[in-house]
Amino acid sequence: MIILALNCGSSSVKYQLFDWERKEVVAKGMVERVIIGDSFIMHEVPGRETYRKEYECPDHQVAIDLIIRTVVDADHGVLKDINEISAVGHRVVHGGEMFTRSVLIDEKVLDAVKEVQHLAPLHNPPNIAGIEAAQAVLPHVPHVAIFDTAFHQTMPEHAYLYPLPYEWYEKYGVRRYGFHGTSHLYVSKRAAVLLGKTPSECNIITMHIGNGVSHCAIKGGVSVDTSMGLTPLEGAVMGTRCGDIDPAIPAFMMQKENLSAKEIDSILNKKSGVLGVTGRFTDRRDVIEHASNGDHRCKVALDIEAYRLKKYIGTYMAVLGRLDAVVFTAGVGEMGWPIREKTIEGLEGIGIKLDRERNKGAMTRKRESLITTDDSPIKVFVIPTDEELVFTEDVVAILNGTYTDHMNFDYSFARTDFVRK
């Protein structure tokens, strides 16, 4: 059984082909610069050189057509025929309150996703375009939606409601939803295995740190709070997003700079965060390098980011009452040891003892690592995320009729005998 996982962004389409019987990725890649011009595909097959091809993709339909042609290509593909694909799993960023689990996509589901796209105007439209494009190319196979927000639908009312007019929630759905759900799900279940416990026995703080950043407080295996809110703008400092700020700042700056609502929204989402402070970088590797060479703004950007990460650990520790582990994941979380060090140092008083050598050695996306001392009461792990594996397992379980929900389903990666490939 071959499962195709798709993640459609506004100008990119990521994909992965997973062979369920062999339990391994047989191909993965990305089409970049969709719509905006100079498009190209980067196609990776284990054991082969990466294949790159320039091909104009004015829309997601052409991009997905290109992906299908590439995976069945005689020279660069891994499939003999398109009919080898058994099902498609689609990442959908926002499912609103309606979707608490992954679901088979039918007309009713697609209409419901369209109804909540006003809650994620930057993300849901390309997700929808990807679903419709893939259905056109693969009309006879099941398509499954996996929602970023679903994992967080267990949050209690006092955690997801904002202290705003209640009518805004009733009329417009204004509340905290949270994102990166599949990533938080995966690494929290892996952390439970590393702790030698079941997820229901664990209290864990997971920190997904990439260009986008989110934290999750997980109590007994379920999300009870998360840092992103109605949109992915709230929370920690991010690559280009501001995260938590005084809500009066946008109105203040709109008056000072004569900005429209659209312009201020763009600045907060695309020109703030690490980029805003440094003035030129979003890649933390560049920020770390220039900070070490004396660039004050880069140093301040790192200090701000680590300080905010540290604050969320303290906040969520108070929420959980008892903490077993903290997990770093995603690109920066997995590879950025200086940021991890800045975040964790000084937390000995609350039971977190960093092992600096272990932390520096945890610089790979292929290994799970403990970065605290053996006698640290609270453990800190670096766990490479695998959202596509969550997609795949949800799809297969839905096809087999064995899927329940993310809390109770028996994921392979939640077992002690799981081996990451």
Curated annotation (Swiss-Prot):
EC assignment: the record states: 2.7.2.1
Active-site residues from the entry: D148
List ligand-binding residues for ATP: K14, H208, I209, G210, N211, G212, D283, R284, R285
Cofactor annotation remark: Mg(2+). Can also accept Mn(2+).
Q: Which cofactor does it need?
A: Mg(2+); Mn(2+)
Keyword terms of this UniProt record: ATP-binding, Cytoplasm, Kinase, Magnesium, Metal-binding, Nucleotide-binding, Transferase
For this record, the Gene Ontology CC terms, alphabetical, are: cytoplasm
Q: Name one GO biological process term.
A: acetyl-CoA biosynthetic process
Q: In which pathway does it act?
A: Metabolic intermediate biosynthesis; acetyl-CoA biosynthesis; acetyl-CoA from acetate: step 1/2
- Its EC top class is transferase
Q: Where is this site: Transition state stabilizer?
A: H180, R241
Question: For binding substrate, which residues are annotated in this chain's numbering?
Answer: R91
Amino acids binding Mg(2+): N7, E387
Oligomer and partners: Homodimer.
Please identify the protein, giving its name as recorded. Acetate kinase
Q: Which organism is it from?
A: Geobacter sulfurreducens (strain ATCC 51573 / DSM 12127 / PCA)
* Gene this chain is encoded by: ackA
